[in-house]
Structures are given as C-alpha cells and as structure tokens.
C-alpha cells in the first residue's frame, strides 16, 4: 500500500525510535537472543520463546429465575425515583426521559440499564445492580474493565439472561464499519470480559474483521 500526500515535497518519516520499540517488543515477548527477535536476532532457536499461556478458565453461567411482574414494577419505580423531574416537551431545556431496562442477574440481584441522550444509534448509558426485593437498593456490581483507550458508557447495550452474555457496541457511523464492540460473561459473581475489538478507521469492514484486543472463551452451561 502506497501512502500519497498532497504537494510535491517528499514526505519524511522519522524512524529514530523504531529500534528501541522493536527491542521492547522482543523483551515483552521474551524473544531476546533468538532467531525470531525483531531488533537483534540471536542464535537461540525460535522454540526457545515461551509458548502462549492458556487463558484462565471462566466459571459457567449458573442461570437465573426470570423477574416476576411485582419485581419488575418495583425495580422500575425505584429507579425512576432517582431521576430528576421530567421536563415538558415545549420547555427550552427539554430532553427525552431516560429509558430503563431491568433484567434478572442472580436470585437476589437485578441488572439495570439507564439510557439517556440517545441519538440515531448512540446513547449514554449507566449500568447498575439493585436488590430484587423492596426497597430495591443499589448493590455492588463486579465487571471487568475494558482495555485502555476504550470509550465507556456510550453506545448500546444488550443482556441475555438465558446465557449470561452482556454486549456493548459503539458505532462510528451508521453502517457500523468502525467503532468498538465488547462482550462479557456472567459467572454468577462478576462479568468477565470475553471479547473486545476496536476499529478506529471507517474502512467498510464488518465487526468480524476488526482487530481483536481481548479474547477469552466463555464456557457453555452444563
């Protein structure tokens, strides 16, 4: 691929820091002194590089009883009590009221999504957990953080109580060829990250072809 720049002046790319960068890569991957080293290949065989360690096994999703009508009504009412008073549509500072979704998480806890400031395909959102019984108080929620540089609390969310899978997506534009996507697996105690991919450039590629920055296999329910 040839990079073309405007104008007639030849482009200059400084590679002064490249050797140090490659040496750091070799150090992290433990390739120093081997024939596969990037900065300064040595005489040790490529087999001297330690193999990839298998990812830690995740606990299977234990399943959960669906929310009853009384639980759902109580949860929605408890969340709405925490929201500011709604504005009338003719008010100058009117914003659409948040959309609230509730899901069963464990026998004692529910998962709550609050969506606000929604555009065509992007919302701001908040994730929390509440007790499934009155007064439906907030409960601790353990969730593995996304890698550095990701965008939190913006985009869209989906949760599937049948499988314990939580997914988020942030599209850079409507056709969905750039942005971020992530998936978590609920193991009965915490949400463990199983997939995170990011495509900063809108290039016509579907999310299945985006660079994967994190991957872990979620076990199936027995």
Where are these regions (language model features)?
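Short, non-transmembrane alpha-helical segments in secretory-pathway proteins
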Residues: 61-93
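Internal interaction segment
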Residues: 2-74, 195-211
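Short aromatic loop motif centered on NTY/YTY
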Residues: 138-222
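Beta-propeller blade termini
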Residues: 97-104, 156-158
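Surface-exposed loop/turn elements that mediate protein-protein interactions on large endomembrane-trafficking
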Residues: 81-89, 127-145, 185-190
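Structural motif
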Residues: 120-128, 176-182
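Acidic/hydrophobic-patterned starts of short beta strands in beta-sheet-rich repeat architectures
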Residues: 104-116, 160-170
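A short, solvent-exposed beta-edge/loop patch
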Residues: 1-10, 174, 183-186
């Amino acid at each position: 691929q040839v990079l073309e720049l405007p104008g007639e002046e030849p482009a200059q790319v400084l590679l002064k820091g490249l050797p140090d960068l490659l040496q750091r890569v070799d150090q992290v991957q433990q390739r120093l002194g081997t024939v596969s080293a990037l900065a300064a290949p040595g005489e040790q065989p490529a087999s001297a590089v330690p193999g990839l360690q298998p990812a830690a096994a995740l606990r299977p999703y234990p399943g959960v009883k669906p929310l009853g009508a009384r639980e759902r009504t109580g949860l929605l009412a408890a969340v709405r009590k925490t929201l500011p008073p709604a504005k009338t549509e003719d008010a100058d500072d009117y914003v659409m009221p948040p959309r609230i979704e509730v899901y069963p998480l464990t026998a004692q806890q529910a998962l709550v999504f609050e969506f606000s400031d929604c555009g065509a395909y992007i919302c701001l959102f908040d994730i929390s957990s509440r007790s499934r019984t009155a007064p439906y108080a907030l409960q601790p929620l353990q969730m593995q953080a996304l890698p550095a540089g990701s965008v939190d609390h913006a985009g869209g969310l989906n949760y599937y109580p049948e499988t314990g899978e939580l997914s988020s997506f942030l599209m850079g534009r409507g056709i969905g060829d750039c942005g971020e996507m992530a998936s978590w697996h609920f193991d009965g105690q915490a949400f463990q990250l199983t997939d995170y991919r990011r495509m900063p450039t809108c290039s016509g590629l579907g999310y299945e072809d985006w660079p994967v920055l994190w991957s872990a296999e979620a076990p199936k329910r027995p």
